[in-house]
Amino acid sequence: MKNKLKAYIIHENEEWLIPLRKALEKFDVQYEEWLLDDMTINIDQSPPNGIFFSRMSASNYTRNHLHSNQSSNIILTWLENHNRRVINGTNVLKIEFSKVLQQLLLKQSGFKTPKTIVAVGINKIKEAASNLNVYPMIIKPNQGGKGFGVKLINTINELDEMLEDNLINSSKDDTWLLQEKISTNEEFITRMEFIGGNFIYSLKVFSKNSFELCPADACEVDLDQFCPVDEINDINNSQPSFFIDDDPDKNLAKQLTIFLKKHQIEVAGVEFIRNKDGVPIFYDINTNTNYNLNAEKESKVNKNGME
């Protein structure tokens, strides 16, 4: 009997791996975890044989993993140089770590994105805001996740106060995006999930009290204003924050499938909001995607992201 290849899970957040571990053990998959931050590596050696799955997250530095960018890029490059099978490799890592790159790639493929001005250096934020000159606007760090550092700016005076009081969160690469806040008639954003390059399901996320978004069971949060959308109406507290759409936009899913394949992205969640004209505006690509078990259980779709 032919030996099964061992799976290697490359990550920097133990908490997010809990459901993946359960799924791997359920299917009797032999696996090993590589937690990447500070490290040493002998690049003259060959890596082990196996399948390598990168679960690196752009929010790594918010957990004080300050060297995850460098270590993950080195490890994935080393693996690819030895022709190992890597899921979400170095090309995808660049996309995960840069919201500017995400916006550029989406625009290049014809997807609508928010009006955006990029500021490199905190001293350029006010100039970028003046150039955008659309209020309210959103400021977010180029590398980020779970809404870290995303803030709403209603006026230029409000921005002045934020800068004066050091209320703009630092960015790992000293780069920020200033984006228009999209007007919408919807009470939710949409996140389309893809695994193996295939569309799995579409998740509606109702926002309440935060810019944070993490659909995983490990980080159930209240949501509001976390993406570049206008203020929306409160929803009934009895409704779940996350639920799976029984009637997803299949044409849009097909377009995104082509886009992800073009950029070698095998696992991802892509987020958008529809403006008042019903046009989807894309603002985020999550290549370290997680899944909400409660939403999956309550859905008629009968699909489990981890399995």
Predicted features and spans:
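C-terminal active-site "lid" helix and adjoining low-complexity regulatory extension at the edge
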Residues: 243-251, 260-265, 274-307
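Hydrophobic alpha-helical segments and helix pairs
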Residues: 101-155
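Extreme N-terminal starter segment of soluble prokaryotic enzymes
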Residues: 2-7
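Short glycine-rich anion-binding loops that position phosphate/pyrophosphate groups of nucleotides
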Residues: 57-60, 142-144, 288
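Structural motif
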Residues: 51-55, 138, 177
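Conserved N-proximal alpha/beta basic substrate-recognition cap immediately N-terminal to
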Residues: 12-118, 127
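Phosphate-binding site of ATP-dependent enzymes
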Residues: 151-260
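Protein kinase-like catalytic core scaffold
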Residues: 137, 200-201, 268, 281-283
